[in-house]
C-alpha cells in the first residue's frame, strides 16, 4: 500500500520554509492506519521486544496500537512536568536551543528489549534523547520505527547503528 497518499503536506507550517507532514489523513483511514501499524508490528516480531517506548504526542498514536497488537506494555516519553512520579531526563539540541524529555524512572527494567516508535525522523534529536533515557534505565534499544523519515536532515546519523524501520520517505 502506498501510504504517502495519506500524508498531507502543508507548506510554510509551522513557519516559513517548512513543509509539515500531517499524518491525520492516515489516521482517518482505518485501512491505511491499520496497515501502518501492522507493518511496524511485523518489524517488531523479529526483534523479541518487551516494551514499546514513544515520545509525545504522535509517538503515542503509533506506539500504543503496536504495543496492544504485540500484547506488551507502552512507556511514554514526555516533556518536563507532565509525568506524575519520579522521572529521569535527557536533553537534546533543537534549532534554537535545548529541549528536554522525561520518562518515569521505573518505566523500563534493566535488560528489557525496547522498540522506540514515533511518527517522524527528522534531525534525530528526539529519538536520540529517547534512546538515552531507555539506556539510562538499563534497557536495550532493539530498534526504532517511524512512519516518515525526512531525507537530508541526518536523522540516521544521530541514531548511529541502531536498526531502523521507516515506512515512508519525504524530502527534508
UniProtKB/Swiss-Prot annotation:
Catalyzed chemical reaction(s): AMP + diphosphate = 5-phospho-alpha-D-ribose 1-diphosphate + adenine
GO biological process, one term: purine ribonucleoside salvage
GO cellular component terms listed in the entry, alphabetical order: cytoplasm
Pathway: Purine metabolism; AMP biosynthesis via salvage pathway; AMP from adenine: step 1/1
Pfam families with a match to the protein in the record: Pribosyltran
Location in or out of the cell: Cytoplasm
Molecular function via GO: adenine binding; adenine phosphoribosyltransferase activity; AMP binding
Keyword line: Cytoplasm, Glycosyltransferase, Purine salvage, Transferase
InterPro entries for this protein: Ade_phspho_trans (IPR005764), PRibTrfase_dom (IPR000836), PRTase-like (IPR029057), UPRTase/APRTase (IPR050054)
EC number: 2.4.2.7
Family to which this protein belongs: Belongs to the purine/pyrimidine phosphoribosyltransferase family.
Protein role: Catalyzes a salvage reaction resulting in the formation of AMP, that is energically less costly than de novo synthesis.
Database matches in HAMAP family: Aden_phosphoribosyltr
Subunit structure: Homodimer.
Protein name: Adenine phosphoribosyltransferase
